[in-house]
Curated annotation (Swiss-Prot):
This is C-type lectin TsL. It comes from Trimeresurus stejnegeri (Chinese green tree viper). Disulfide bonds join 26-37, 54-154, 61-156, 129-146. Glycans are attached at residue 28. Its main location: secreted. GO terms for molecular function: carbohydrate binding; metal ion binding. Homodimer; disulfide-linked. A motif (Galactose-binding) lies at residues 119-121. Galactose-binding protein which recognizes specific carbohydrate structures and agglutinates a variety of animal cells by binding to cell-surface glycoproteins and glycolipids. May be a calcium-dependent lectin. PANTHER family: MANNOSE, PHOSPHOLIPASE, LECTIN RECEPTOR RELATED (PTHR22803). Met-33 has been shown to be oxidized to methionine sulfoxide but this probably results from sample treatment prior to mass spectrometry. Residues 1-23 form the signal peptide. InterPro entries: C-type_lectin-like, C-type_lectin-like/link_sf, C-type_lectin/snaclec_domain, C-type_lectin_CS, CTDL_fold. Belongs to the true venom lectin family.
Length: 158
């Protein structure tokens, strides 16, 4: 009887410790924040190919969206630490209507924007996707031709 109680207690402890662990998409080279996991991918892709890659990477993933300055600064620091190419990085903001009405691919509210100087400009009426600018330490954004190839930042829900 004593052994049964001991084994049962041991199993209960294991169960409780495992049930407290959240399954997430975060790996050692990812940034967990606000119920999301952010991961940089260095392989250059067009904006559309990058979004499709994120969606296939794990359920609930998209190119990253930003909603506060503090969040943007943490992500910029993460990219600076883990991004090998030191080049621009796609995020999930685009202008589908081509009328400066920017939308996130995850359909979250466009409540925060952080454009670089004189941006967005839709240069030559061809720039409708958004990248983080490396020369700003990944703090500021630029609209870019969607067919350009950049590294990209995915975000996944825990």
């Amino acid at each position: 009887m004593g052994r049964f109680i001991f084994v049962s207690f041991g199993l209960l402890v294991v169960f409780l410790s495992l049930s407290g662990a959240k399954g997430s998409c975060c790996t050692n080279d990812s940034l967990p924040m606000n119920g999301m996991c952010y991961k940089i991918f260095d392989e250059p892709k067009t904006w559309e190919d990058a979004e499709m890659f994120c969606r296939k990477y794990k359920p609930g993933c998209h190119l990253a969206s930003f909603h506060r300055l503090a969040e943007s600064l943490d992500i910029a620091e993460y990219i600076s630490d883990y991004h090998k190419r030191q080049a621009e990085v796609w995020i999930g903001l685009l202008d589908r209507k081509k009328d400066f009405s920017w939308e996130w691919t995850d359909r979250s509210c466009t409540d925060y924007l952080n454009w670089d100087k004189n941006q967005p400009d839709h240069y030559k009426d061809k720039e409708f996707c958004v990248e983080l600018v490396s020369l700003t330490g990944y703090h500021r954004w630029n609209d870019q031709v969607c067919e350009s190839k950049n590294s990209f930042l995915c975000q996944c829900k825990f």
